Amino acid sequence: MTTLYEGAYAKLNLTLDVLGTRDDGYHDLRSVMQTISVRDDIEIDVGTGKPWELHCDMDGIPTDEGNLAWKAAKLYLDTIKKDPDGITIRITKRIPEGSGMAGGSADAAAVLRALNRHYGEPLSIGALAELGAAIGSDVPFCTICGTAMVEGRGERVRPLPNMPDCLFVICKPEFSISTPEMFRKLDEKQVYKHPDNAEWNPPFFQAISVRSARTCTMSLIPWSLRRIWN
């Protein structure tokens, strides 16, 4: 039996523009995403000789095939046609649930990276990200990490210059808002005005290119998404 360890890093949406609905029921997005240091810890025992198991230290998280980490392991092993002779996945949660920080997607991406490394990296990071798109919209970015422009429903990830080292203040209230509910409210409001912080905002992208955290922050004001809930 071999035990694998991998960090599952959360993400923030530095910008988020919802461009419209798609025929498949998803929404087309344009977002600058950023990996941050908040993370879940993933341990994977490969070759346990037992049926698959998944354990998580946070209540309310699925511990069966409904968990994205489980789905990622199965999809990866089916893709490379490997039988691991039993897998146990252990997840130590630190990413707040229902925070929009891609906790489940980050876990799935970490499983993809860990298993790919274990089997000698038969898939490139781009192929892993493409595989992740079948699991969840945030999985491709969470597989690649860093700073990136993410488009489509999340399957198109274009790396940008890395943000400078800086601190983000993250305030997670006691309540949570589900992503499907957020998009449903957006559709109900029929918001047609797009924020100025999308790709056509030169100050924001110039700020990223010169790695200026303060300039990046100032270029994102005002924040347009608040009117969805008013």
Segments from the language model and where they lie:
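ATP-binding N-lobe of GHMP and related small-molecule kinases
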Residues: 1-99, 117-126, 163, 172-175
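Short, basic/glycine-rich phosphate-binding loops at helix/coil junctions
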Residues: 49-62, 111, 208-217
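Amphipathic alpha-helical interaction/coupling elements
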Residues: 68-72, 131, 215, 219
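Gly/Ser-rich oxyanion-binding loop with an adjacent helix/lid
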Residues: 82-154
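Conserved, helical-rich catalytic subdomain that frames metal- and/or nucleotide-binding sites
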Residues: 144, 149-230
